[in-house]
Amino acid sequence: MPQITLVFISLSGNTLSFVKRLSLYLADNYDYHVKQINIKDLKHETFPVKEEFVAILPTYLEGGNGVDSGEVEILTTPLGEFIAAHGNAQRCLGIIGSGNKNFNHQYCLTAKQYAKRFGFPLLGDFELRGTPDDISRLAQLIMEASSRHSSNDTQTLPNS
């Protein structure tokens, strides 16, 4: 059974709820085993992730509007530290952002910042706890990213 790892941080429970439902969907519909790493549980510890993973990040920013001010991440920085440590960013297939669309420009801004900072794609987004449509859409995008990564690995193998 193939495996995918979801590395995330959940502060209010919305992201955790989404990750649990996404994990079940990936298992039931794609026969994937999903390993979950909630950064909140690690208490600022880091370690090398050996396998490919997808990061899932809620948006927590300091006030403002995300244009003139309010672009500074708060509360979720341990996920960025984890991705930056031990070369983990190189094994990240991409990031999924979550947020609240009421915050306009700030919606999923932190995930966009991580994609730019680490050089991996923003795979998609969902609002609050996510809907069943979000689960199926993002599961498909994860599978596509995993497939692209696998085919790139195959192309870089030396000819025998």
Curated annotation (Swiss-Prot):
Highest taxon in the source lineage: Bacteria
Entry-linked InterPro entries: Flavoprotein-like_sf, RNR_NrdI
One Pfam match: Flavodoxin_NdrI
GO biological process, one term: protein modification process
Record Gene3D superfamilies: 3.40.50.360
One MF term in the entry's GO annotations: FMN binding
Leader peptide range in chain numbering: none
Family: Belongs to the NrdI family.
Name this polypeptide is given: Putative NrdI-like protein
Organism: Streptococcus pyogenes serotype M6 (strain ATCC BAA-946 / MGAS10394)
